Amino acid sequence: MNAPNSINLKSFVLNLADLFDGDIEIEKAARRELSKVSEANFSSKQCALPAQILSVMQQSDAHPICADIVEMPFDWRPPETSKSPLYAKHSIFKSHIELVGPDGLVESDSIRLGLYGMLPNSEYGVRTHPAEEIYIMLAGECFWKRGDAPYCCERPNGRSYHPSMMPHASKTEDQSFMSVYVWVGDLSTDAYEYSGLPQK
């Protein structure tokens, strides 16, 4: 990797810390870990974001950091959190990159942090995992279901917080979305469970 790319990625990752400006411990943990990043390098692979996700990232209400994200040569792929065939089927409309974590561009055993988006008119069903988690919306809109509560729409700067083992689901309607997320606690995916779409 050339030096400019390495510097740009490190600066970008450090800038992500400013997004986690809430008072809850998970956001404080994200800020602490991001502030420690001393080196970051791009993967040798690259896959572009879908046009429908890029479009919402260029809207006037998108978080300013989206302008940097679209310039990064990331390898955007559906996540592989579960080996379940149903999970794989319900992941083809997702775009994801783990930036910091056990599988990230920056290695960490304290957090998993990445960028995650979905195409419009898509639904990612109910899942649970030991890690505590928060998503911060960067562009577009996403409807989040937490526990037994109904779906709630979140837009840029909105948050969806999921304590350990809380069932949660997400879906889009007319718009795609882009977000940044962080896991803390048990970062293993061994106990991740995906149960499919919520019952109507």
Language model feature labels by segment:
Residues 123, 134, 158-161:
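Residue-level marker of beta-strand positions
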Residues 6-109:
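A short, N-terminal "cap"/entry segment at the start of jelly-roll beta-barrel domains
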Residues 102-104, 122-123, 166-168:
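Short beta-turn/strand-loop junction motif enriched in small, turn-promoting residues
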Residues 10-16, 173-200:
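Double-stranded beta-helix
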Residues 110, 115-121, 128-144, 183:
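Short, conserved beta-strand element in jelly-roll/cupin
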Residues 129, 148-149, 194:
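Short coil/turn segments at secondary-structure boundaries
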Residues 147-168:
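Short acidic-glycine-tyrosine-enriched beta hairpin
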